[in-house]
Amino acid sequence: MLAGLELAVREVNDSGGIVGRPLELVVRDTAADPQRAVAAVDELARLGVAALAGEYHSVVARAAAARADALGLPFLCSSAVLDALTEQPTEWVARLAPAQSHGWQIYADFLFSAGHSRIAVAADPSVYWASGARILRDYLAPRGGTVIELDMRALDPTAVCDELVDNRATALLLLVGHPEPAVSIVKSVRRDQRLAEIMIGAPAGQPEFAEWVTLLGDDSAAIPFLRYLPERLSPLGARVETALRERLAEAPSFVAFEGYDTVAFLADVLRSYGEDRARIAESWPRVAVEGTRGQIQFSRTPDISVWQWAWTPIQVVDRDPAEPDRFRILHAC
């Protein structure tokens, strides 16, 4: 994400900045810690920033959004998908990434269409994973599907394999952290001959990381996950992809595009509406910007408390078993 943010800031400044003034990016690492996020929002507000951008971790983004809302600080959330970013509807927060309920329903539809009706989820305790499991259950249960929850506080990877066999699951979804315990679970399942036919999935996108291939090798492939990219990038998206690839020395993930699009949108807002925080927040539904993955425009969406881009393109993809560095598109929406 940071690479995308920084690239966009550099391009804005190379083209003259904001009405002749340079755009400054002030970075604070929240380190997946909600308390650090709240402290960072407080600090950045005191420093006089015009708006907040970023955040990958959903639970952390929720803490940041609540604080930004309380302080009257515009926050364009780049990547976090948890539906309830704020407890009450707010004018101060907008989001690029699709809501979890939207993306994970698409993933559930992919599973069901592929013939999976007995689905186990290896889940860590968190609001995000619990929400994901509920979305899957709400989609699959009316269609005759079953979601079997495996509490990873009580099971090691070997015990997970036994549970999969006992419950006759045809798919296992990794609703757990990366690299651990996700990597250890994949290794155990792949080595268990009883589970040779089971599909492993990771809707939250852990296989997107290059480290996934480094740690798992051939076992990294054929694990479908969600990513938020179109089937074909626009000319802008293709140009940004090339620049990001040079910057990162590897193919960029969709999160880098989210970072770039965040700054592209905010820069347009700042040019048109200035630096006043209230005017920035008022602009969310009034601005349309061509991003790397389509035209970005925010609106009110049922059951979503923030201004939402509805929706970014969504794919279900996996790594190709014949070439794990290459992605296969399995389903697109």
Give the predicted meaning of each segment.
Residues 1-333:
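Extracytosolic ligand-binding ectodomains
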